Amino acid sequence: MLRAGGRRLLAPGLRRVLGGGAAAPVAVGGAKAYHERVVDHYENPRNVGSFENDDPSVGTGLVGAPACGDVMKLQIRVDESSGKIVDACFKTFGCGSAIASSSVATEWVKGKQMEEVVTIKNTEIAKHLSLPPVKLHCSMLAEDAIKAAVKDYEAKKAKLAQKGEEKAAEA
């Protein structure tokens, strides 16, 4: 991705046509641009940042795609009493589709129960963003990052429970 004069250019020779109309990729000179949802989440990513790893209410998923070099860190903060995800954030090093997939994933997991978020499929993210087949790996990373964050949170929770049992046995 290039940045010129405060505006991001999607690729040389491509322009976004702004205004009302269908939410579809814009073709200029035979090349397809990103879908407007990808552009929106890339230019205005939601929930960028990170939480403290040692916070017991935080689960961290770190995944990567060696083929393209994309790396995605997605974190969730869970209300321990309700099991509901109350916040989420991400940091992604990768293409616009990877950043958009991360941004969408954090939006979708907020306010949901842990059991719900592990059912989010990459195909749903890809469909929402209208990702082309060559970019499906970006949505797969987002799905994997969600599952890894949930697994990390559950492992932390189990470790804390075990420590609590050990302390109770010592007393």
UniProtKB/Swiss-Prot annotation:
The keyword Metal-binding applies. Pathway: Cofactor biosynthesis; iron-sulfur cluster biosynthesis. The keyword Mitochondrion applies. It comes from the Eukaryota. Residues 1-55 form a transit peptide. Its main location: mitochondrion. GO terms for molecular function: 2 iron, 2 sulfur cluster binding; ferrous iron binding. Its cofactor is [2Fe-2S] cluster. Induction: Down-regulated in roots when grown under iron deficiency conditions. It is found in: Mitochondrion matrix. Scaffold protein for the de novo synthesis of iron-sulfur (Fe-S) clusters within mitochondria, which is required for maturation of both mitochondrial and cytoplasmic [2Fe-2S] and [4Fe-4S] proteins. First, a [2Fe-2S] cluster is transiently assembled on the scaffold protein ISCU (ISU1, ISU2 or ISU3). In a second step, the cluster is released from ISCU, transferred to a glutaredoxin, followed by the formation of mitochondrial [2Fe-2S] proteins, the synthesis of [4Fe-4S] clusters and their target-specific insertion into the recipient apoproteins. Belongs to the NifU family. This is Iron-sulfur cluster assembly protein 1.
